């Protein structure tokens, strides 16, 4: 695991693209449905339990949250989408902002698409994957909470998702458990590729 992930620090939070840092360097986004475990993945990756705020309330992340690895590289936690208990107008704004981010952010180098292994590939997951595919953006699908399923069931879900993504040339999938630190090295290696890090 590259040391820069452990040195990650909060940079800024903004409600729309207008408040984002300058469009330069490298950014990798973490996208996922509400309560899929995005914040837990970021905290596990960085070895910082409180870097990304973990909430039991779906849709708590309502801003673009930027974490700086070094002066040229950033992790971005996108607003949680899906069944978040927020007004429809807010959901509509999230959709517009996220779509704009994918299509206008030149420094975007990759996506980590976080899915709860018990509920993979919902409509919004497919939407994000289609956005990534439309701009040829490399994507790592993380099937989180794999410890919630027995090994056989987790493997079956992995294979099912793996078959679903065969038509996408820049997409890979892996199992992940923040609790057991499963899949951390695989994720780190993929992020190194996105960011141009060399071990």
From Swiss-Prot:
InterPro entries: G_ENGB_dom, GTP-bd, GTP-bd_ribosome_bio_YsxC, P-loop_NTPase. It comes from the Bacteria. GTP binds at residues 32-39, 59-63, 77-80, 144-147, 176-178. Mg(2+) binds at residues 39, 61. Pfam families: MMR_HSR1. Its cofactor is Mg(2+). Residues 24-197 form the EngB-type G domain. GO terms for molecular function: GTP binding; metal ion binding. GO terms for biological process: division septum assembly. Keywords: Cell cycle, Cell division, GTP-binding, Magnesium, Metal-binding, Nucleotide-binding, Septation. GO terms for cellular component: cytosol. HAMAP family: GTPase_EngB (MF_00321). Belongs to the TRAFAC class TrmE-Era-EngA-EngB-Septin-like GTPase superfamily. EngB GTPase family. Necessary for normal cell division and for the maintenance of normal septation. This is Probable GTP-binding protein EngB. It comes from Ruthia magnifica subsp. Calyptogena magnifica.
């Amino acid at each position: 695991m590259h040391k820069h992930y452990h040195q990650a620090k909060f940079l800024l939070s903004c409600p729309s693209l207008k408040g984002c840092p300058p469009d330069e360097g490298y950014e990798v986004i973490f996208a996922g449905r509400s309560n899929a475990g995005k914040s837990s993945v970021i905290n596990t990756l960085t070895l910082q339990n409180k870097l990304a705020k973990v909430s039991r309330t779906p849709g708590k992340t309502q801003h673009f949250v930027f974490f700086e690895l070094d002066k040229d590289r950033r992790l971005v936690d996108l607003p949680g989408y899906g069944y978040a208990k927020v007004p429809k107008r807010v959901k509509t704004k999230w959709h517009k902002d996220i779509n704009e981010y994918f299509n206008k952010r030149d420094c975007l180098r990759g996506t980590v698409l976080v899915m709860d292994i018990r509920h993979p590939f919902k409509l919004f997951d497919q939407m994000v994957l289609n956005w990534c595919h439309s701009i040829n953006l490399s994507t790592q699908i993380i099937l989180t909470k794999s410890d919630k399923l027995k090994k056989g069931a987790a493997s079956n879900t992995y294979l099912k998702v793996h078959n679903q993504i065969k038509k996408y040339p820049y997409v890979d999938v892996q199992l992940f458990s923040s609790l057991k630190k499963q899949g951390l090295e695989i994720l780190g290696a993929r992020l190194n590729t996105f960011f141009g890090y060399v071990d």
